[in-house]
Amino acid sequence: MTSSTLSQPIKQRGWFDVLDDWIKRDRFVFVGWSGLLLFPTAYLALGGWLTGTTFVTSWYTHGLASSYLEGANFLTAAVSTPADAMGHSLLLLWGPESQGDIVRWFQLGGLWTFVALHGAFSLIGFMLRQFEISRLVGIRPYNAIAFSGPIAVFVSVFLMYPLGQSSWFFAPSFGVAAIFRFLLFLQGFHNWTLNPFHMMGVAGILGGALLCAIHGATVENTLYEDGEQSNTFKAFEPTQEEETYSMVTANRYWSQIFGIAFSNKRWLHFFMLFVPVMGLWTSSIGIIGLALNLRAYDFVSQEIRAAEDPEFETFYTKNILLNEGLRAWMAPVDQPHENFVFPEEVLPRGNAL
């Protein structure tokens, strides 16, 4: 028997390997390579939002008070979009608009682009974090894929929509009441609620909530009686091998109610993933359509008949009049820099009035 004197060459560990080990070390808050993007951008986005809602006015961009310092509360404070005249400028602090003057930067709305762009990158960093940890733990990356839904909504609403319009001004400001104003704006100027992509989004989100409630209730209903404690939750051990609820009983229950039921846990849970994420994706596609000013359903025949026949009106024609009212009364206040003036005779009056 012969023995080989050959030996495997020892791979030299470089600085990258050492850094890779350190950055992926098991610690209380995992960092990882994704953390290099996530943590700085999330910190700056949140810090910018807190700074803006606390101190920064929207007087120069919207003619509004929007900070705690001016008397706004949590629901009415916001980091407002830049002035319409700024177009799609990134509004860098050192750019030609502000020239390094931070007060001027605040006045022009520079915090909004700061929060929007850092917020978008932080969401992407969080998605990459889920990919990275999935790889390290050895599981499939469906959490990251599901999180693409919120990312698609954020990017379409806060970035793609204003890019299709004349400026960042028409994006939503970062605040509760500001988002509600944006919803009314979308309805008045785009008839958003009649858009089929919005309908699919509503079906996905509400359908996902319904599936979540049904699934949770069904599991709670079919738990095994496997503990002596007064609280059934104490009977569960994270490392136990046996099932904690009866899929067979759950299947029998829903088969009796609907005549059809899930018999495959994997398909059931994929469906619970698919429905809400598809709703988010479809609504994002719809928002991009609005960015391009694409029209959805226009039932022109009903509008013509309503204009000719004082006794004919449908819920659709009433909604069209409501949209006209939103535009007519909202635009002068919403866009004060345009100096809109609508005489009384052009304001919408429905047949029922």
From Swiss-Prot:
The chain crosses the membrane at residues 41-61, 125-141, 153-166, 208-228, 279-295. GO terms for molecular function: chlorophyll binding; electron transporter, transferring electrons within the cyclic electron transport pathway of photosynthesis activity; metal ion binding; oxidoreductase activity. It is a multi-pass membrane protein. It is found in: Host cellular thylakoid membrane. It catalyses: 2 a plastoquinone + 4 hnu + 2 H2O = 2 a plastoquinol + O2. InterPro entries: D1/D2, Photo_II_D1/D2_sf, Photo_RC_L/M, Photo_RC_L/M_CS, PSII_PsbD/D2. Chlorophyll a PD2 binds at H198. Its main location: host cell. GO terms for biological process: photosynthetic electron transport in photosystem II. PSII is composed of 1 copy each of membrane proteins PsbA, PsbB, PsbC, PsbD, PsbE, PsbF, PsbH, PsbI, PsbJ, PsbK, PsbL, PsbM, PsbT, PsbX, PsbY, PsbZ, Psb30/Ycf12, peripheral proteins PsbO, CyanoQ (PsbQ), PsbU, PsbV and a large number of cofactors. It forms dimeric complexes. Belongs to the reaction center PufL/M/PsbA/D family. Photosystem II (PSII) is a light-driven water:plastoquinone oxidoreductase that uses light energy to abstract electrons from H(2)O, generating O(2) and a proton gradient subsequently used for ATP formation. It consists of a core antenna complex that captures photons, and an electron transfer chain that converts photonic excitation into a charge separation. The D1/D2 (PsbA/PsbD) reaction center heterodimer binds P680, the primary electron donor of PSII as well as several subsequent electron acceptors. D2 is needed for assembly of a stable PSII complex. PANTHER family: PHOTOSYSTEM II D2 PROTEIN, PHOTOSYSTEM II PROTEIN D1. This is Photosystem II D2 protein. The gene is psbD.
